[in-house]
UniProtKB/Swiss-Prot annotation:
Classification via SUPFAM superfamilies: HydA/Nqo6-like
A Pfam match: Oxidored_q6
Family matches, as PANTHER family: NADH DEHYDROGENASE, NADH DEHYDROGENASE [UBIQUINONE] IRON-SULFUR PROTEIN 7, MITOCHONDRIAL
Record text on cofactor binding: Binds 1 [4Fe-4S] cluster.
GO MF terms held by the record: 4 iron, 4 sulfur cluster binding; iron ion binding; NADH dehydrogenase (ubiquinone) activity; quinone binding
Membrane topology label: Peripheral membrane protein
The species this protein was found in: Triticum aestivum
Protein name: NAD(P)H-quinone oxidoreductase subunit K, chloroplastic
Swiss-Prot/TrEMBL GO biological process terms: aerobic respiration; electron transport coupled proton transport; photosynthesis, light reaction
Enzyme Commission designation: 7.1.1.-
This protein's encoding gene: ndhK
Lineage: Eukaryota, Viridiplantae, Streptophyta, Embryophyta, Tracheophyta
Length: 225
């Protein structure tokens, strides 16, 4: 049994018969074999690549990198996400089967980093696009920090109920329409223009100056790129 934390065993008899719940058994199997999809766009991904070597050996955590989102249950975003890349990231997230998890690695992924000040094309935080489970700050984070983030994610998985997670994600989902980004009633806050609504493909060429509001932070109700 994995000693990371849960599932809690209800009882153990003298005959070594272990009883538990299907949900705990499912959580234990998932936290012991995470299959990540590596979405690296910048220098933070180089730090994650060092985990593959013999010094850190991330295979001992059951991590099996996948090249297809349909075979992955964890997406690790590392690096800057631009407005043109945003629909592709959301599409990859949609193609992953439930339950699925996200680790945001590095300052550029979490807040936009040094590109968020004057850049017209940088997304100020990947949580504007997809729900994030674990934030991993740093520029770049060390491999030890990546291992710590994976450990925290495994603890979170061990405590959750799959049905509750699926319901909460279905209420605030990101999805693509004709390869365009369209966010419905997001609970996240940001500096995006609130009045930008989805109209037609001919009206989607929105200037970058009107896309962000630097004066006040408002809830992002609808967003189109």
């Amino acid at each position: 049994m994995n000693l990371i934390e849960f599932p809690l065993l209800d009882q153990t008899s003298s005959n070594s018969v272990i009883s538990t719940t299907p949900n705990d058994l499912s959580n234990w199997s998932r936290l012991s074999s995470l299959w990540p999809l590596l979405y690296g766009t910048s220098c933070c991904f180089i730090e994650f690549a060092s985990l593959i070597g013999s010094r850190f050996d991330f295979d001992r955590y059951g991590l099996v990198p996948r090249s297809s989102p349909r075979q992955a249950d964890l997406i690790l975003t590392a690096g800057t996400v631009t407005m043109k890349m945003a629909p592709s990231l959301v599409r990859l997230y949609e193609q992953m089967p439930e339950p699925k998890y996200v680790i945001a690695m590095g300052a550029c992924t979490i807040t936009g980093g040094m590109f968020s000040t004057d850049s017209y094309s940088t997304v100020r935080g990947v949580d504007k696009l997809i729900p994030v489970d674990v934030y991993l700050p740093g520029c770049p984070p060390k491999p030890e920090a990546v291992i710590d983030a994976l450990t925290k994610l495994r603890k979170k998985i061990s405590r959750e109920i799959v049905e509750d997670r699926t319901l909460s994600q279905n209420k605030n989902r990101c999805f693509t329409t004709s390869h365009k980004l369209y966010v419905r009633r997001s609970t996240h806050t940001g500096t995006y223009e609130q009045e930008l609504l989805y109209q037609s493909p001919s009206t989607l060429d929105i200037s970058s100056e009107t896309f962000f509001k630097s004066k006040s932070s408002v809830p992002s109700y609808k967003l189109v790129n």
